[in-house]
Amino acid sequence: MSRHYDKSLDNRLAAIEGHVRAVRQMLTEDKECEDILLQLSAIQGSLEKLGKII
């Protein structure tokens, strides 16, 4: 893998990590289920895109 490709993957993983942390915070703050599910859907989509790239 090239360095550019590695950085791209790292950026995507960092974004996914941020979404997961946001979901944890939402659960702690007892946010609406619909909002949490929307974030989980975004995480799933990001993971699928990452898998296709890899």
Q: What are these model-predicted stretches?
A:
Residues 1-54:
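Solvent-exposed interaction patches of small proteins and small membrane subunits
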